[in-house]
Structures are given as C-alpha cells and as structure tokens.
Amino acid sequence: MWDVSFIPLRPGSLSGPVTERSDAARNRERLLGAARELIEECGADGLTMDRLAERAGVGKGTVFRRFGSRAGLMMTLLSDAEAEFQGRVMFGPPPLGPGAPGLERLIAFGSARIAYVLEYGELARAADESAYNRFDVPAAVLWHRHIELLLREEGMDADPRLMAMALSATLDPERLLHAVRVHGIEPERLAESWRELVTRVVRGA
C-alpha cells in the first residue's frame, strides 16, 4: 500500500490518519463489522440504519452521528477500496498510472473503473443514493478532473470539463450494474464500448 494521503470519499473527512478515543474507535469498528455482516447476509439493499443499530447494540442516533446517513455509511465501507484504486491511478504502473499517453490512460481508467464498480457495485450504488455523494464528494471530483486533464493532454480544448462530466456519467455504478444484471451485458463488452467511446472523442478533438 502507498504511504501517502488520498482524496477522501466522504464529505468533510480527512485523507490522513485521524486520532480517535479508544472507545470511539472500538464503536466505529463494531458498527462497520456489523454492517459488513449484514451485507453478507442480505446484500447492501438490506442494510438499514435500524438494522445496523440493532445488530451493533447501539442506539439509532449513534449510527447517524457516526456516519451522517446511510449513503455516508456506504462511503465509509468503500474507503479502503477507493484508496487502493486511487493509488493505482496516481502512482501505479502505466497505462492506468502515469507514463502512458492520455488516450491509453483514459482507456485503462474506464476499464479499471468498470471492474471496480462490478466488484464493489452494491456498496457503490448505495453510496450514490445521495446526489451530493454522486457528483461532489472529493473522490468524485478527482475522477472528473482526472478525465478532464487527460482530455486536455490529448488536445481537446472545446469544453473538456463538460466532456469529462459526460464521460463520467457512462461509468455510473447504477447504470453499469443495470447493464450487467438486467441486460446481461458482459463486462468485457462494457470495457470495449468505453474504449471506442473515448477513442472517438479524443480523435475528434
């Protein structure tokens, strides 16, 4: 694991280590452990704040004070996986990491993000229930900016920010999960579609 700070998933959270009282840290781990158990038993859709409070043996208010909302809880559960993904993008080998041309990195980013969503899809979809989580949390802004910078690197000057937002929408967790689970589209086909899309966008720039 990279010894650096990463962009946080949750609004207002810190990317570095946070010092907690020992009892607060134990409560946090008990809540997260209970949340993971519930997800294993009944899926992310079955994880409610009421069920979590009951399983962890705490009041519902304690759960809300710790995580803010159900989406905030899902964001916390996703944090470790997101930090690992950020490390691969920012410091890992090319083409996902630095050192490859912009188009190659765009293709690799989309393919890797599709795989990430399919692995952590239930959590990612539940975390995206809040419009703020979907569009404005620091990690989401980071990926929009990453795509924008790669588009600029490839010579796009006709509103690359807006194009980055449009491309990001195709990697929306709920959209990807729907494509795979409802329409039976294979992940490899999604990745190939992303490759063709960004290639057309870049070469048309």
What function would you assign to each model-found segment?
Residues 76, 90-119:
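Hydrophobic alpha-helical connector segments
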Residues 74-81, 120, 124:
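Alpha-helical DNA-contacting segments of helix-turn-helix folds
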Residues 1-42, 46-55, 72-75:
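Basic, helix-initiating cap at the start of DNA-binding domains
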Residues 28, 49, 71, 75, ...:
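Short, structured helix-loop boundary elements
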Residues 70, 77, 81, 85, ...:
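Hydrophobic/aromatic residues within well-ordered alpha-helical segments
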Residues 37, 41, 69, 91, ...:
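Conserved amphipathic alpha-helical interaction elements at protein-protein interfaces in regulatory
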Residues 124-129, 133-137, 141-144, 152-197, ...:
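Hydrophobic/aromatic-rich alpha-helical bundle segments in the mid-to-C-terminal region
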Residues 57-67:
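Short hydrophobic/aromatic patch on the recognition helix
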